[in-house]
């Protein structure tokens, strides 16, 4: 199973984001076993001119490969996460719960 992780990132540092992701990945592996594949949606090297729409387009592209999506804490506060959730709902991508 390929899982996309949707996570609020605005105003957070990379270390905090990575720590939360690692905890989620561990929980997913405990639930689904080692066969779970995590789609890495954390963009580390942003182009200079990248804006929010560009980032969202990359997230949607990655989400298109997913069998399921996990929405992390406070997802509803982030516009991008809300859009990703709407896409899951509209296109039948399973919303994974831990």
Language-model features: locations:
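Conserved catalytic or regulatory cores that recognize and/or transform ribose-phosphate-containing ligands
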Residues: 1-98
